[in-house]
Amino acid sequence: MAQMLLHGTLHATIFEAASLSNPHRASGSAPKFIRKFVEGIEDTVGVGKGATKVYSTIDLEKARVGRTRMITNEPINPRWYESFHIYCAHMASNVIFTVKIDNPIGATNIGRAYLPVQELLNGEEIDRWLDICDNNREPVGESKIHVKLQYFDVSKDRNWARGVRSTKYPGVPYTFFSQRQGCKVTLYQDAHVPDNFIPKIPLADGKNYEPHRCWEDIFDAISNAQHLIYITGWSVYTEITLVRDSNRPKPGGDVTLGELLKKKASEGVRVLMLVWDDRTSVGLLKRDGLMATHDEETENYFHGSDVNCVLCPRNPDDSGSIVQDLSISTMFTHHQKIVVVDHELPNQGSQQRRIVSFVGGLDLCDGRYDTQYHSLFRTLDSTHHDDFHQPNFATASIKKGGPREPWHDIHSRLEGPIAWDVLYNFEQRWRKQGGKDLLLQLRDLSDTIIPPSPVMFPEDRETWNVQLFRSIDGGAAFGFPDTPEEAAKAGLVSGKDQIIDRSIQDAYIHAIRRAKNFIYIENQYFLGSSYAWKPEGIKPEDIGALHLIPKELALKVVSKIEAGERFTVYVVVPMWPEGVPESGSVQAILDWQRRTMEMMYTDITEALQAKGIEANPKDYLTFFCLGNREVKQAGEYQPEEQPEADTDYSRAQEARRFMIYVHTKMMIVDDEYIIIGSANINQRSMDGARDSEIAMGGYQPYHLATRQPARGQIHGFRMALWYEHLGMLDDVFQRPESLECVQKVNRIAEKYWDMYSSDDLQQDLPGHLLSYPIGVASDGVVTELPGMEYFPDTRARVLGAKSDYMPPILTS
């Protein structure tokens, strides 16, 4: 049967199954009184496999899109009555329902039921009993499953490609946290912005864009807190200083983060920290050079002090199999990066306080402080002498000199009702893993800390509407509902006896589907939609990187090509994932990335050919990385030692170049909507039951791309980022969807790549945006550039290589 595109939303309900055969029991599907008698004997004498747990899954061909809870001791007629809200962007001929029996290791299939996709396309509701079949599609006795489905095609969605549209836009539906109004958002590029770096960027209402300084603001927020300081991090390092700009000194700014937190705790401020407990240090990855998280050092530093620092492992939910539990606890992380404090009200005379939160990609640890100059060598005797970070070379050290690894990141400050949602997230996590109940009871401080309330008037043109999203499950957050019905009401997804918040992925999908003109993404990783990859040397169904984001982006571009409209997707990623670039883990991730790009370009080139358009697919979807190259200056830091000869380190030092590490997790849509958080575009971050993540999504209701382009803070922020990356501004950058803009940006980035990769070094790079070094053939196949099999100064393949020993669950 031919496969058809399901692109939209599938509402599905699995009610019950009937007359199942139980392979675990000698009683099989015998009459109930016989089954009970035989199973009682089995349990008494210790034969058989004990209590039977039955669950059902939903697949679009080989892509898993839903899973019920387990029903215990009802192996013949289990009743689930569970409903699913499924975003789909899949080619499929059938919706497949599989009934399984759970085992301590893995599961046993009872059979599968099939509903042809063709029957769903008219959008009518189908309520039906389906035969459960064996692998030969033959019915398994009288076994049946009762399901209900209705498909809503994305093209019939009144919000498809319409943008935010209205100040009444309610936010992303079916989520744990609702959208909040009357908020204020501060956007940060990198940990610091030097004075006078950003040129004049005009905004609406005669205003100009004003940059903000993340670590200075966090320093002030912690310093001025009077009641609470709550911090979560993948890594928190006590020895860093937050204030380092000699042109912008602050009283007490030379204190380390650890000393500052101890000082505040000794003053009576409740300081609670949840730092990821790197239990195994993910041995395979660690060996390849990923940075140590300092978790043990941080815990030891605060031991015996007034600071309550808890190392929390990424514990599984209570429901997984032995293998699943082991995978979660050893392979996945707590990745949220938040700071929550009480803060003075804007009118200084008041004694009342409010909650302010910080959310984004920046951990409070070493290697993160940087500015838009992203110097490789010129700060090694000052800002970065005691904060030298270079995990891509096995033996790198300040003694051997640069290049250091520059760090590009994005963060945000949230004020108003949204800040309280970040606080609630911390409280849920602390109650689950924090141990002692040390959370401040804010209702007891209601005279001092005002409850959630707007910080901007509705008529203020700078107001924001903001929504909080997460990837997290009941193993990491306290108080999730126990039943699928209650979970659905709370905007959560129920799985095989686990409750999951997967709203970050939902937020990305929702924003992409609404997009009208362009999308700009910066992310540390870009891989996924593996169900649509070509099966070259792999079985796509074995990879498990099932999130929809790359496929949604490709389908958005395809829809615009078919409609004869312009649309451009810009994606900035690191040159390679942090670590030794030749290592198995880095090469495996690059291989997944290449397959993801190729899947997207294949869709786009097929759409262009179908319309008879001869065009470069990079005019519609284009990838970049960041890098720097510096000529040697007099008076530069002189290292005491030399790198080992003929190594990546020595070659990079000689060539005076290195990548700028893109650690950001951000998407801008039409200059009107922005997502910032900790979540990468990979399955680990988007799954919900793997790495724990947090993100905000927001817009300014008075600055929407309705009748004219949006010119609010999000536009100014994108233009500031483009100035940082390109080293210039141009009027054409105000129309990113236009052919003129994308071709100009691509030309500049190709020129910068040629300068970066050249054997000659005549001058500093004028900008940092480099065209990602791949070619795209007319059929969408991603190729090496001529003479560019390896990244400069390395023996690391640009297109990556499939790993024979690294499990996909770890690298995807």
Curated annotation (Swiss-Prot):
Residues 1-130 form the C2 domain. Stable from 4 to 37 degrees Celsius. Activity is reduced to one third of the original level after incubation at 50 degrees Celsius for 30 minutes. Keywords: Calcium, Hydrolase, Lipid degradation, Lipid metabolism, Metal-binding, Repeat. Residues 1-46 form a propeptide. The active site is at H335, K337, D342, H663, K665, D670. Residues 330-368, 658-685 form the PLD phosphodiesterase domain. A 1,2-diacyl-sn-glycero-3-phosphate binds at H335, Q524, H663. Its cofactor is Ca(2+). The keyword Nucleotidyltransferase does not apply. GO terms for cellular component: plasma membrane. GO terms for molecular function: calcium ion binding; phospholipase D activity. Its EC number is 3.1.4.4. Ca(2+) binds at D190, H374, H408, E724. Optimum pH is 6.0. Monomer. C2 domain is a calcium-binding fold, and the binding promotes the protein association with membranes. A lower affinity toward calcium can be anticipated for PLD alpha due to the absence of two potential calcium ligands. Belongs to the phospholipase D family. C2-PLD subfamily. Hydrolyzes glycerol-phospholipids at the terminal phosphodiesteric bond. Plays an important role in various cellular processes. This is Phospholipase D alpha 1.
